[in-house]
């Protein structure tokens, strides 16, 4: 089992009283690599409010504060030369915010800088403020799936080293390529794993047809996830693809400690570190449901169950809102506990 972790890159990710800086992200990335995580991930929102996750609005404002984020692709490019082996991933890019040719060119550059360590995740988009800030309206789900399909067609062709001429309903390109004329071979510099985030039936058909991997997050119970895996397998059968060739990663909120007493103390600390309102009304017992929560031995049992459902990588989120991390010692604590859990469950790489 590979282990990934979310990186802090929103203003609320560490200390919501001050803006996030790249030095904060770099420090967290180094801590993640040092403790043995296999991958680090950033997301893609122009801004994010915490109302969806229980956050409280400012007392003098009529709406939730809009927390700013560092750009994901620029951040990964900057992290590439200061890390060594860890995978650098997007979880996930909003397909509508960049033309696929530009996405491919940037991804190819980051892959080159990092020595082939980029994992490119793409999604159909769900956060309406991203579209409003971009100056457009968020399309209905059907149109977003159609746009994602066209985007993936172009990316897949470019990553395969093909000369791309494409006229679609949403995207067009003529003569785009990542191939180099120097060596005469049709290929990009280094292979770039391409995965899709989401869980709907149509999205899983897009995964089966175009993607190397599939991700969904942040809370899932075993039965619900198993049903989604069955849908993925049906999609693979439709396109005559081996389901085992689809790399499954799963994002989960995570709290783990060696003993119940330590787990309770850890939960209390995460509540204290949370942005205002996010931890309100939460208790440890209810937080266990659908999340990677428990003692090291309990989490080992859960991870073994996820592995039996085809999960090859678990991406943990330390806090109670996406990409809320708290502090670097939280990263180190999670890394140490999760490696113990992998050993107990015989899931070490």
Language-model features and meaning:
Residues 1-38, 119-121, 139-140, 153-156, ...:
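C-terminal amphipathic alpha-helical "assembly" element
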Residues 1-82, 192:
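N-terminal beta1-alpha1-beta2 module of alpha/beta enzyme domains
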Residues 52-64, 107, 258-273:
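Aromatic- and acidic-residue-enriched segments that line the glycan-binding/catalytic groove
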Residues 57-88, 147-154, 238, 330-349:
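Alpha-helix-loop-beta-strand connector modules within alpha/beta enzyme cores
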Residues 68-74, 198-199, 294-298:
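Short secondary-structure boundary/capping elements
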Residues 88-97, 249-256:
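Conserved strand-turn element in the central/C-terminal portion of the radical SAM core barrel
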Residues 90, 96-210, 230, 243-244, ...:
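Internal, glycine-rich beta/alpha segment that forms the wall or movable "lid"
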């Amino acid at each position: 089992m590979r282990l990934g972790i979310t990186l802090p890159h929103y203003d609320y990710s560490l200390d919501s009283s001050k803006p996030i800086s790249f030095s904060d992200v770099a420090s967290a990335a180094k801590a993640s690599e040092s403790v043995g995580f296999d991958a680090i991930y950033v997301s893609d929102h122009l801004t994010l409010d915490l109302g969806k996750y229980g956050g409280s609005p400012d007392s003098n404002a009529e709406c939730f504060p809009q927390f700013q984020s560092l750009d994901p692709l620029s951040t990964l490019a900057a992290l590439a030369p200061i890390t060594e082996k860890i995978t650098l991933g997007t979880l996930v890019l909003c397909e509508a915010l960049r033309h696929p040719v530009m996405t491919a060119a940037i991804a190819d550059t980051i892959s080159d800088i990092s020595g082939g360590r980029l994992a490119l995740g793409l999604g159909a988009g769900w956060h309406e403020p991203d579209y409003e800030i971009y100056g457009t309206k968020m399309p209905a789900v059907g149109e977003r799936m159609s746009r994602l399909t066209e985007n993936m067609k172009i990316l897949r062709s470019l990553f395969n080293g093909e000369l791309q001429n494409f006229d679609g309903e949403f995207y067009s390109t003529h003569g785009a390529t990542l191939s180099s004329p120097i060596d005469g071979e049709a290929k990009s510099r280094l292979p770039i794993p391409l995965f899709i985030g989401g869980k709907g039936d149509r999205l899983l058909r897009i995964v089966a047809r175009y993607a190397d991997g599939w991700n969904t997050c942040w809370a899932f119970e075993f039965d619900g996830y198993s049903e989604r895996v069955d849908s993925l397998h049906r999609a693979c059968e439709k396109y005559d693809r081996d389901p085992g060739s689809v790399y499954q990663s799963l994002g989960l909120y995570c709290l783990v400690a060696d003993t119940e007493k330590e787990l309770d103390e850890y939960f209390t600390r995460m509540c204290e570190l949370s942005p205002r309102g996010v931890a309100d009304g939460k208790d440890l017992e209810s937080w266990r449901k659908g999340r990677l929560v428990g003692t090291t031995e309990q989490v080992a049992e859960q991870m073994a169950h996820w592995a039996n459902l085809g999960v090859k990588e678990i991406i943990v989120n330390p806090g109670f809102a996406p990409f809320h991390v708290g502090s670097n010692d939280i990263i180190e604590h999670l890394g140490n506990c999760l490696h113990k859990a992998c050993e107990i469950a015989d899931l070490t790489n």
